[in-house]
Swiss-Prot record:
Protein name according to UniProt: ETS translocation variant 4
PTM text: Sumoylated; enhanced upon ERK/MAP kinase pathway activation it positively regulates the transcriptional activator capacity. Sumoylation at Lys-95 probably requires phosphorylation at Ser-100. Transiently polysumoylated and desumoylated by SENP1. Sumoylation is a prerequisite to polyubiquitination which in turn increases proteasomal-mediated degradation. Probably polyubiquitinated by RNF4 and deubiquitinated by USP2.
Lineage, broadest ranks: Eukaryota, Metazoa, Chordata, Craniata, Vertebrata
Annotated tissue distribution: Epididymis and brain.
UniProt biased composition (Low complexity): 158-171
Gene giving rise to this polypeptide: Etv4
Similarity annotation: Belongs to the ETS family.
Amino acid sequence: MERRMKGGYLDQRVPYTFCSKSPGNGSLGEALMVPQGKLMDPGSLPPSDSEDLFQDLSHFQETWLAEAQVPDSDEQFVPDFHSENSFHSPTTRIKKEPQSPRTDPALSCSRKPPLPYHHGEQCLYSSAYDSPRQIAIKSPAPGAPGQSPLQPFSRAEQQQSLLRASSSSQSHPGHGYLGEHSSVFQQPVDMCHSFTSPQGGGREPLPAPYQHQLSEPCPPYPQQNFKQEYHDPLYEQAGQPASSQGGVSGHRYPGAGVVIKQERTDFAYDSDVPGCASMYLHPEGFSGPSPGDGVMGYGYEKSLRPFPDDVCIVPEKFEGDIKQEGIGAFREGPPYQRRGALQLWQFLVALLDDPTNAHFIAWTGRGMEFKLIEPEEVARLWGIQKNRPAMNYDKLSRSLRYYYEKGIMQKVAGERYVYKFVCEPEALFSLAFPDNQRPALKAEFDRPVSEEDTVPLSHLDESPAYLPELTGPAPPFGHRGGYSY
């Protein structure tokens, strides 16, 4: 709209009219209409237009918000704005769910018709678990801020129904929840947490006892549920011998016997040690199976299989003084205490390493050469180690010839009783003294031995690895000639 002043007269007159409103809006039909012949004041025109326009929009917004408003505590209703039922009264929606979990738990529990919610039957046990504390919570004035706006009942009715529910539940304390299925006990945890959040936070003096009362009975339900669910399948599986596995179905050992006998050839027996597995199983606590059964199927092979070579000893070797082989296998003592373990060259290195033996054997100072100052004394000590009182230097020298062929020792030419090691000193001592353990040399015989007790092949203990080779190249030096029988 535009006005032009020319000579004090209005150049153009434009009448201002309002648009006709729809007859359905009562408040909008009473809008002010300006006569068409009257000129509009330029100062009052924009405010009048804006006020009427905003009043029209605000009326629609208030109506739309009032129709579509959903209570904050009602979490299950989702308004459908595209349907024709979107502008109904919210009170009708609240009355459809009078027994929802957001109402009083005692009221929903006292009524026994089947509900779509599993929470109603669970709050009875949580409230009856400690009834005096629940009654004290429900006692505040009706105007307390923690009350839910969806509760359609009065405070007196709630307290009376709570007392009835508490008294009825206390009369049968152990029959309410023990007979239910497992799916019923999984609900109270969610129910208690969702129920305490709107009411426990609104009441300032009572949030701690209210949350403690509802959360305390809830955790035992899942624990009882697990015990009931896991025992039955295990006992059913344990009663079936064919489907049970060894060692995992409780203490039902008759069911696992079939699997044990099938695993006998896999774990219990080897080609070289036939009887190892049954010798070390009784300390584990198995009294039922006999030693001949393959008891490795019990599931204890983890503690037995890592060291079968160390502890497995053939039973027929437990005779005489060969028992010492089992002791040396564990490295509890020096390995030279075992009969047959100490070789002659290691014995000579041990004598040379001890300065107290310098009067009968010593280093010459030329590399790795050494001299037997008293060869008979060296032979006597070697006989003590081997429990051979008939040992002499003649027999000792024949044994040293094996090391010539193996490249360990050599005889120094032109000098009597002088020998030398051909390997490096570091390698010599590392091989002679494994794990830095010096041999414990014996000073006396273990028992008095006469020459009648010896047998023709008993001297094989001196050097069991090279005697077949020694008989070939040196037949004149037969061992029979050196003994008197």
